[in-house]
Amino acid sequence: MKKILFIISLFMFLTIKGQNDIKAEKLLNKISEKIDDAKSYQIEFTYTLENKLEGINQDLEGSVIINEDNYLLNFMGIKQICDSKNIYTIIDENEEVIISSVEDEGDQTIKPSQLLKFYRKGYLLIWDKLEINSNDRIQFIKLIPIDSNSEISHLLLGIDIDKNNISKLIEIGKNKTRTILNVKKIIYNPELNNNSFVFEKDNYKNYYIENL
């Protein structure tokens, strides 16, 4: 569950205050405009957890579809549906459904409308390295938390400057743990099924359903 919250929380933001690098701020504003123009989007990603001291190197695939305050997240074999009022966490392996209220989740749950927007609040922005691959050019922006008590040392946000898309997010913890989110694909304004964000209870008749 913590990993799911990490994936969601990776994308949260509003507006940043402080002495930001002008080039970094300008590039991120361009990305923000593209994100804000979309009514919905679909993201396929790879999540990697690394800690050399602990010998941890784990890769996991996932996807999320967002439409305003609704979302459908598939990650670690768990499906999470939010219909803007309730969050339904479906664990097929345990034949279990956990239902919680968006309102009750409070600050622990990031509003889907804020996904892909985490860099707008709480960070100092610094222009960083340019990574050139065979198929793309990724410009990294370094984000340093303003909160000195943060467990995060810094973030590296990779922007595909040819497609104006977020490509990669690297989080460096003060405990030397690295979490990497590689965005494999972003589709803006995808065609959505009317039931994409609807929890259909009849499909889970044999499941244990818990209301928090």
Predicted regions mapped to residue ranges:
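Sec-dependent N-terminal signal peptides
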Residues: 4-13
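N-terminal leader/targeting segments and the immediate start of mature chains
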Residues: 16-56, 69, 203, 208-212
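Extracytoplasmic
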Residues: 38-40, 59, 68, 82, ...
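A generic structural motif
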Residues: 46-52, 74, 90, 144-146, ...
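An acidic-aromatic
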Residues: 61-110, 179
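Flexible, surface-exposed loop/linker segments and immediately adjacent secondary-structure boundaries
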Residues: 102-137
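Gly/Pro-enriched, hydrophobic low-complexity segments
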Residues: 123-130, 134-204, 208-210
